[in-house]
Swiss-Prot record:
Its main location: cytoplasm. This is 3-deoxy-manno-octulosonate cytidylyltransferase. Its EC number is 2.7.7.38. It catalyses: 3-deoxy-alpha-D-manno-oct-2-ulosonate + CTP = CMP-3-deoxy-beta-D-manno-octulosonate + diphosphate. It comes from Pseudomonas putida (strain ATCC 47054 / DSM 6125 / CFBP 8728 / NCIMB 11950 / KT2440).
Length: 254
């Protein structure tokens, strides 16, 4: 029997670095349409776009997507997912996968992977993905979120800072990584149990989440387990800047 799960794609117009991002055209289609089409190639039983903007709503309706209007005042994307799950009436044990609306090249296989990861680990409220880091500059880049997990694959913590801090190596130089230390970059795709989403909303943000601007820290703060696997396929480039947009356009318009 195949695993049943729902994909939700949050899509908002407000972006400081790339205004109007979900509706920017790539190969003649809005960016969010590319994401939706990739998600539909996964094993998801349902793919829903969640937005708080009528222009996105109308664009998504035009290409045939299931789309829902949500409140505009959510603290995080996870809060938005909780609203969608409640509106759809999903049961507490249902699995919802959050696929970011700015990843038009997202591999469908890793959407399936993160859902299966959560289904295989009933002790976890969240599952997510990571990939190895091989370059020192990525370790020191605050836009690359680092993650450390325990021997069972459960997250210990996430940080924008270098994690772990290799004291002896970094005291001498920061252009080389220490041997035997598995640095990993977090991939911002999550699978959640709906029951967890309802709890998440009721808690509100914690100081650690706000300091790092990482909403998954709210879950760890409250003792929720997050299971992590390395992605079976390298995730494609997301679109955060005009340079990213041009790179993706070249790939899809070639």
């Amino acid at each position: 029997m195949s695993l049943e799960f729902t994909v939700v794609i949050p899509a908002r117009l407000r972006s400081t670095r790339l205004p109007g991002k979900p509706l920017l055209l790539i190969a003649g289609k809005p960016m969010v349409q590319h994401v939706w089409e990739q998600a539909r190639k996964s094993g998801a039983s349902r793919v829903v776009i969640a937005t708080d903007d009528t222009s996105i709503l109308e664009a998504c309706q035009a290409f045939g997507a299931e789309v829902m209007m949500t409140r505009a005042d959510h603290e995080s994307g996870t809060d938005r997912l909780a609203e969608v799950a409640a509106y759809l009436g999903l049961p507490a044990d249902a699995i919802v996968v959050n696929v970011q609306g700015d990843e038009p090249l997202i591999p469908p296989v890793i959407i399936d992977q993160v859902a299966a990861n959560l289904a295989a680990h009933p002790e976890a409220g969240i599952a997510t993905l990571a990939e190895p880091i091989h370059e020192p500059e990525t370790v020191f880049n605050p836009n690359a979120v680092k993650v450390v997990s325990d021997k069972n694959g459960l997250a210990l913590t996430f940080s924008r800072a270098p994690l772990p801090w290799a004291r002896d190596t970094f005291a001498k130089a920061r252009d080389v990584l220490p041997e035997g230390v598995p640095y990993r970059r977090h991939i911002g795709m999550y699978a959640y149990r709906v029951g967890f989403l309802h709890d998440f909303v009721s808690w509100g943000p914690c100081w650690l989440e706000q300091a790092e601007a990482l909403e998954q820290l709210r879950a760890l703060w409250h003792g929720v387990r997050i299971h992590i696997e390395d992605a079976i396929e390298a995730p494609a480039v997301g679109v955060d800047t005009p340079e990213d947009l041009e790179r993706v356009r070249r790939l899809l318009e070639a």
